[in-house]
From Swiss-Prot:
One of its GO terms (biological process) is tRNA pseudouridine synthesis. Formation of pseudouridine at positions 38, 39 and 40 in the anticodon stem and loop of transfer RNAs. Homodimer. The gene is truA. Belongs to the tRNA pseudouridine synthase TruA family. This is tRNA pseudouridine synthase A. CDD domains: PseudoU_synth_EcTruA (cd02570). The active site is at 51 (nucleophile).
Length: 260
């Protein structure tokens, strides 16, 4: 049978999602726990790989197993074997044609940014940080230039392995919650470092260093060198994919409520 799992994790201690020789990744920790619980080697696929330091609120994975167990037993059993900063939120049986990556309609991320004269301490690793005040209207005007289908080469990491730089950015919402800003992104897919590179540009505009129209110039240049530096990974959260209703999978977890 094929199982889909929703997984949340704090990415601070890990070298990203994808398995590495060091085995200090979220995928490695999850597969070790699942393999021990299932008493057979479990290999997983995920909806979207995250970099070192990036957090996940609802990463979706799938794997195949000959075992027929109740979904809750997979949740409780796997969590008993996982480190405290990784948790399985839910488990669902899915048809064999379901694929956590290929079946996704879109992917969602949030970036949480603290605006404060003092760097974060209690929230260290959980939020990005800027000590200069930001102008919301200017950032929203700049963000509007990125909506729709574009070549996002200017926001692409040099190591990006995507076959095409053309992506459809469906949503980029900017809101303020006390001392924190929340930037929420939704697209069919994202390039490597795309969100962090966009964040660097939005903050540049928000601080008044560049006008909102500058972001359109950066986009059209299709040249990474004209954009702002890549922003910190600390405040980036993978909110998870969206799927068509017929798959019967959740589109959020209780972890969503803990973000500003």
């Amino acid at each position: 049978m094929r199982l889909a799992l929703g997984v949340s994790y704090n990415g601070q201690a890990y070298q990203g999602w994808q398995s590495q020789l060091s085995r200090q990744t979220v995928q490695d920790q999850l597969e070790m726990a699942l393999s021990k619980l299932a008493s057979h080697r479990v290999s997983t696929l995920c909806a979207g790989r995250t970099d070192a330091g990036v957090h996940g609120l609802m990463q979706v994975i799938h794997f195949d197993t000959p075992l027929d167990r109740a979904p809750n037993s997979w949740v409780r059993g796997t969590n008993a074997l996982l480190p405290r900063d990784i948790a399985v939120e839910w488990a669902r049986p899915v048809p064999p044609e379901f694929h956590c990556r290929a079946s996704a309609l879109s992917r969602r991320y949030a970036y949480i940014l603290l605006e404060s004269p003092v760097r974060p301490s209690i929230d260290a690793g959980q939020v990005g940080w800027t000590f200069k005040p930001l102008e919301q209207v200017a950032m929203q005007q700049a963000a509007s230039h990125l909506l729709g289908e574009h070549d996002f080469s200017s926001f692409r990491a040099s190591a990006c392995q995507a076959l095409s730089p053309v992506k459809m950015l469906q949503r980029l919402d900017i809101s303020r919650h006390g001392a924190c800003w929340r930037f929420e992104f939704e697209a069919n897919a994202f390039l490597h470092h795309m969100i962090r590179n966009i964040m660097g540009c939005l903050i540049t505009v928000g601080q008044g260093k560049k006008p909102p129209e500058w972001l359109k110039e950066v986009l059209l240049a299709r040249n990474r060198n004209v954009a702002a530096p890549t922003f910190s990974a600390h405040g980036l959260y993978f909110l998870g994919p969206r799927y068509a209703p017929h798959w019967g999978l959740p589109d959020r977890t209780p972890a969503f409520d803990r973000l500003p």
